[in-house]
Amino acid sequence: MNYGKIKKWNQMSGWGFIEGDDGYDYFVNVSNLRKGIKIREGIRVKFDITHGQRGDEAENVSLI
């Protein structure tokens, strides 16, 4: 499990980036959020990392 904060979030498009505690940025799509959570820039999250078309991506994103 990885931890970080929402660095950028585009509510209209449903995507953004998580700044991981490891210093890397991870692309995140609304489809990779745990069901029912609402996010905004600056909140802390936990997530798994997968290798997608855009490089490393966050999945199973949930609030902490």
Regions picked out by a protein language model, each given a short descriptive name:
Residues 1-10:
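Structural detector for short beta-strands of small beta-barrel domains
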Residues 34-46:
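Short nucleic-acid-contacting surface segments enriched for D/E, G, S/T with interspersed K/R
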